Amino acid sequence: MAELETGAVPIREEFLVKQDGNKKRKRKERGQNKRREKIHVKENNALCPAISIGNECPYKENCKFPHDVEAYLATKAPDIGDKCPIFERYGVCPAGFKCRWLAGHVVINADGKYELIKKPDGQFTLFTVNTVGKEVQRKLRTKQLDLSKAESIISAVLGEEKPDPSSKVSNIPEENRDATSAISEGKETESVSLEETGVLKNQTVSVNVDLKEISSQARSNIALPTLRPQEKNLIDWRDRKILAPLTTVGNPPFRRLCGSLGADTFYSEMAMCYPLMQGHQPEWALVRGLNYEREMMRGGRRGILGVQLATGKLWQATKTAQVIAEQCDGVDFLDLNCGCPIDLVFRQGAGSSLLENPGRLLRNLQGMDAVSGQIPVTVKLRMGNKDDHPVVKNLIGRIFNETNTSAATLHGRSRQQRYSKNANWDYIGEIASKVKSMNERIDELPEDSLRTQPLSLIGNGDCYSWQDWYDGVNKGVDTVMIARGALVKPWIFEEIEARQFIDKSSTQRLEMLEQYCNNGLEYWGSDSQGVNTTRRFFLEFMSFFHRYTPIALYEVQRPRLNDRPPLYTARDEMETLLASNKVTDWVKLSEFFLGPTPERFTFTPKHKSNSVEEAEG
């Protein structure tokens, strides 16, 4: 076996490419291309949306878009192909005359005019869920939406309302009731800002708390209207095949691809609560999903879809949870992100910043759970912010005692560590053991406890094979969440089901890319704008997908996510192209399915690597 540097994939010697030992290694780049240029290519000649699908325009002569179909088609970009993938599947194409595969569903009628074709049983059955309308977004911007339910719960969480004598916490000592929401881990005092209500600013009430005098009963209860056990939907998290929330690349077309390969639990991309409450349309687009994600999956379980939120403020978490619970039609659970390490999120007091403020973290969970109706709430955690200071061992007990959280996901890394070292699954195992012990004593909790269900623990970090998944489950967690591993190898869910490695050929991997593009065209549209959007996200996906090294080339079949292969010779020409780390080759692959790139098209991947170069088409 050839000698390999630490972190290198053990490639069989006959596939290795000999290198000049005197060649200077290029410095590895990390992080994100934060200042990358984004160019949105749009059609120069628009067509009325109603006319484009063969309908009459309700605005008629007052419409701001042209209605001349022949003039539009005369200047329209050439068709990419003569078979529309959407029409072939559904018998109808929602893009109409704007479709870049128009030849597949248009004819010239007896009057010499273009006419769209629709099969007798043609129906576009892919529906988008969790679409919040423009009117709701307008009311959010103008603060006209009724959020009184959230406001009353916020007041209760902050202890601003006197508890009803008949409430579940009436037997808590008076001095402990006001202190309950002000407990902070490792501190004797904490200031509770009224700014968290979203109403008052620059006013602070300080609450002196002696931790030694606060009873355990007071710590596990707050004066707010909790739901009865039967009013919360219960989720069995055991052995679920969970696809992690993935910023930029975790879009509905990618989630649909993973669903076809065995995933059954999905998250939206992380959405920030503040722009959601401002009615910011691009942020609300992150919440959307597909009806497909909640249908029966190949493993025999119904798929579930969650919405992940990030915020550091109680009023944002609670009010956003109310809006989503009341306005969205496809949410199975809400997730509070307390693990995001990104500076932009951390500096706002959100993400992993909440690990340093457990009192605020718990209040956010309490508010979300109380306002979300039947929708359960989950939380995403990291070990801590610093390598030498893990905090979850203490925090998980408070989450169990002081909230009704359905599940907690633990990423076995610190914020400081990012992805530079392997995830600490021994620590995850310790937390799993503690959660199991607490669940065994759930019947011993007082009747006025908020907890009405066991707490599930989901492990996360470095899952790249079926062996990693089962090793994680053997640590005691209910299931393992898969993130980057699914981007590099989307069929990892098939491997878990089969309990063996599956070596996909270059032809099979190319078919996956075609499926991804077709998913994108169905979701974003098969017009020019939809094609360009699909191409952009396809290239982001390729920045991970190209990293796969065929398992047949391994000398030792135990792939690790952070390992990088040395230069090797692939088994065929297409496999070589799929393994290329050049953006120009990724663009070439996109042209197989989406046609030539526009003249002004440029692309810089969000995630840096040695291979990244700007590509122009």
UniProtKB/Swiss-Prot annotation:
Documented EC number(s): 1.3.1.89, 1.3.1.-
Catalytic residues, chain numbering: 340
Record bears the keyword Disulfide bond: no
Chain intervals annotated as zinc finger (C3H1-type): 42-70
CDD domains the record matches: DUS_like_FMN (cd02801)
Region (Disordered): 160-193
Co-factor requirement: FMN
Keyword tags: Cytoplasm, Flavoprotein, FMN, Metal-binding, mRNA processing, NAD, NADP, Nucleus, Oxidoreductase, tRNA processing, Zinc, Zinc-finger
Residues forming coiled coils: none
GO cellular component: cytoplasm; nucleus
Effect of gene knockout: Decreased ability to complete gametogenesis.
Gene Ontology MF terms: flavin adenine dinucleotide binding; mRNA dihydrouridine synthase activity; tRNA dihydrouridine synthase activity; tRNA-dihydrouridine47 synthase activity; zinc ion binding
Disulfide pattern: none
PANTHER family: TRNA-DIHYDROURIDINE(47) SYNTHASE [NAD(P)(+)]-LIKE
Known role: Catalyzes the synthesis of dihydrouridine, a modified base, in various RNAs, such as tRNAs and mRNAs. Modifies the uridine in position 47 (U47) in the D-loop of tRNAs. Also able to mediate formation of dihydrouridine outside of the D-loop of tRNAs. Catalyzes the synthesis of dihydrouridine in some mRNAs, thereby affecting their translation. Dus3-mediated dihydrouridylation of the mRNA encoding alpha-tubulin nda2 is required for meiotic chromosome segregation.
UniProt similarity note: Belongs to the Dus family. Dus3 subfamily.
The name this protein goes by in its record: tRNA-dihydrouridine(47) synthase [NAD(P)(+)]
Taxonomic lineage: Eukaryota, Fungi, Dikarya, Ascomycota, Taphrinomycotina
Gene that produces this protein: dus3
